[in-house]
Amino acid sequence: ESIDCEAYCRQYRSQLNRIPPFVVLIPSYGDIGFCWEPFDRYNRVTSRGRIAIPMYTKNLKTALLTATADLRWQVAKEKASYYWMEEGLTGNYYQWFQTQKLKGDVKEYFIEDYLVWMTKESEGIQKLEREVRNVFWRFMPFSKDIKEELKTRAPIYQELYQKDLNRQMSDGY
């Protein structure tokens, strides 16, 4: 959460509410966590989701990140409803997926890219494609401290940071 400050936040009436999910420990081995349920179907606004994590993992950070990525994907997809392929995080990522003509599950690619985003890109190591980095920077922004540090590292981050500033200035009108 120190890197992805809005990982467990949902917006309601133009206010961000932090709603951490319940963590279900599964008595198994593995490195992959997953989203059991993004939120309760009767209370989508304030209900806590459920993520499942194996008890015995080689790398707990990877298990938590895959579960968080799955939770983010499911929440964004449910929020966009019928338009999940057209708008928001899932829509923009899906459009990139289609232009690349990739095969397979979009969510699996998203989870892999989210792992790279949180482990490599947050440290300034550029591993993602430019379009994916743009989508993640816009819809899953880093904390302000990380953004300030990254803008001095590479011109691509400086450009993304400048786009953020321009977007903030235009939102005021």
Where are these regions (language model features)?
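Active-site-flanking segments in enzyme catalytic domains
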Residues: 2-173
